[in-house]
From Swiss-Prot:
Official protein name in the record: Heat shock protein 83
PROSITE patterns to which the protein is assigned, alphabetical: HSP90
Gene3D superfamilies the UniProt entry points to: 3.30.230.80, Histidine kinase-like ATPase, C-terminal domain
Gene designation: Hsp83
Intrachain disulfide bonds: none
PANTHER family: HEAT SHOCK PROTEIN 90 FAMILY MEMBER
Pfam hit, one: HATPase_c_3
Transport among keywords: no
Keyword ATP-binding: yes
């Protein structure tokens, strides 16, 4: 029997923000997945840090990962992480009743014409889920509390109740009920494209449940089982008795056995596919990285078939901290002197999450043939 649900009103600024997200047209809706994956990664960081001083924190689940499950039949996209999870008070406070300091600032920025993709910088990235979903449920289990489920269709209120259905062990499961006009976000290819673009260098495995097909060899009678069942059902429905010729039974059976043939059928199955196998080598010490590793990373970053000509890998510490990994390609780009071309090819990341690849202030225009990342 489902537990009694408590209803809470969204804090005024949050309700206003959600209304803005739902009722304004944004073309860049795909950032919702980047934000939810970033939140999942933060939750995984937290449990990992806690486990460094108290390894028993991982007794509720040692494997740290993020899993994406699209379900076209139900029209849902599920994001699961085995991170720190949320207590009941976390769900109530963090997802609705206490506005983060960035809520108002973000709304002001939006109204001033800022891009929706900046939402994560203001600490309210979770609400971007409502760009593509008309209902969201968040089931969460923290080591210090029972499992609870948060639910809202963004109508000014949300509910929280205890959940005894499917134990998570530890972590969070977010189910997005995708809007009818946004179902392309349930396509495997679309999800892979977004993860590859925005979350390729997240420090935990991102697994996608994919549907595949394989060939299976079966004997004719296995393949015909369903047909037999249908015939038997038909006979039961008619009044005519079944006439058997018992005299030739043994001979017929022997012939059947000899004549049994194998046939190949196609069967569908699902399995997890890891989407972020390329690791962010710029976070490592340059002394530990071989030229081959730089070469492989350069090719995966740029889709160039040739090795790079030169590489510069450095970090800056102080008031502003960043790491940079810059490559000079072996060949001059064919459009080097075109005015209309993209101003630079440096990708900007913040904590391994892709932000943009057109930040003109990163390098001067005359160096726009360089490729690389700044994090």
């Amino acid at each position: 029997m489902p537990e009694e649900a408590e209803t809470f009103a969204f804090q005024a600024e949050i309700a206003q923000l959600m209304s803005l997200i739902i009722n304004t047209f944004y073309s860049n809706k795909e950032i919702f997945l980047r934000e939810l994956i970033s939140n999942a990664s933060d939750a995984l960081d937290k449990i990992r840090y806690e486990s460094l001083t108290d390894p028993s924190k991982l007794d509720s689940g040692k494997e740290l990962y993020i899993k994406l499950i699209p379900n076209k039949t139900a029209g849902t996209l599920t994001i699961i992480d085995t991170g720190i999870g949320m207590t009941k008070s976390d769900l109530v406070n963090n997802l609705g009743t206490i506005a983060k300091s960035g809520t108002k600032a973000f709304m002001e920025a939006l109204q001033a014409g800022a891009d929706i993709s900046m939402i994560g910088q203001f600490g309210v990235g979770f609400y971007s889920a409502y760009l593509v979903a008309d209902k969201v449920t968040v089931t969460s289990k923290n080591n210090d509390d029972e499992q609870y489920v948060w639910e809202s269709s963004a109508g000014g209120s949300f509910t929280v109740r205890a959940d005894n259905s499917e134990p998570l062990g530890r972590g969070t499961k977010i189910v997005l009920y995708i809007k009818e006009d946004q179902t392309d976000y349930l396509e495997e290819s679309k999800i892979k494209e977004i993860v590859n673009k925005h979350s390729q260098f997240i420090g935990y495995p991102i697994k996608l449940l994919v549907e595949k097909e394989r060939e299976k060899e079966v004997s004719d009678d296995e393949a015909d089982d369903e047909k037999k069942e249908g015939d038997e059902k038909k006979e039961m429905e008619t009044d005519e008795p079944k006439i058997e010729d018992v005299g030739e039974d043994e001979d017929a059976d022997k012939k059947d056995k000899d004549a049994k043939k194998k046939k190949t059928i196609k069967e569908k199955y699902t399995e997890d596919e890891e989407l972020n196998k390329t690791k962010p080598i710029w976070t490592r010490n340059p002394d530990d990285i071989s030229q081959e590793e730089y070469g492989e990373f350069y090719k995966s970053l740029t889709n160039d078939w040739e090795d790079h000509l030169a590489v510069k890998h450095f970090s800056v510490e102080g008031q502003l901290e960043f790491r940079a990994l810059l490559f000079i390609p072996r060949r001059t780009p064919f459009d080097l002197f075109e005015n209309q071309k993209k101003r630079n090819n440096i990708k900007l990341y913040v904590r391994r999450v892709f932000i943009m690849d057109n930040c003109e202030d990163l390098i001067p225009e005359y160096l726009n043939f360089m490729k690389g990342v700044v994090d």
